[in-house]
């Protein structure tokens, strides 16, 4: 069974399951007629300076260095993946996260998951259920109309 899920999903796995045997991770499959390379869909953390200072700039600069990221990577169950090609993958807390991060590092295309940027009523509500409805047989128009109605209701 294939299931698309985020890097936090191993936290929900039962004890004793083995990577590569009971579960695995892979790139999103391409069309049979078109090679999409290694596409990755994900989220990300953005930082913004609201009050400029030397200390703030130094801290943000530090966050861009592999060492700061490797600290997060080492925390068991953090789900922290990093696109910085200078990181040491051995710093990850598990083989699972090393493998997940390798997928990210080898991506040829990265796209932000739009639902992460939507208001909760849409991203975790009508958009989510709409995608399930679409894969269960409802028409694209019917699903899109329902999602649009949700947007209209929160304006």
Regions found by a protein language model. Give the residues of each.
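Positions in alpha-helical segments
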Residues: 44, 58, 128-129
């Amino acid at each position: 069974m294939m299931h698309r899920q985020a890097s936090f999903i191993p936290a929900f796995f039962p004890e004793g399951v083995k990577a590569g045997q009971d579960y695995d991770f892979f790139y999103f499959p391409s069309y049979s007629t078109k090679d999409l390379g290694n596409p990755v869909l994900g989220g990300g953390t953005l930082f913004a300076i609201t009050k400029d200072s030397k200390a703030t700039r130094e801290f943000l600069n530090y966050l861009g260095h592999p060492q700061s990221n490797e600290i997060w990577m080492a925390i068991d169950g953090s789900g922290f993946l990093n696109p910085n090609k200078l990181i040491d993958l051995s710093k990850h807390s598990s083989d699972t996260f090393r493998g997940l991060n390798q997928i990210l590092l080898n991506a040829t295309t990265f796209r932000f998951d739009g639902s992460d940027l939507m208001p909760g009523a849409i991203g975790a509500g009508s958009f989510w259920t709409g995608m399930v409805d679409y894969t269960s047989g409802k028409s694209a128009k019917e699903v899109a109309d329902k999602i649009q109605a949700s947007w209209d209701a929160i304006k």
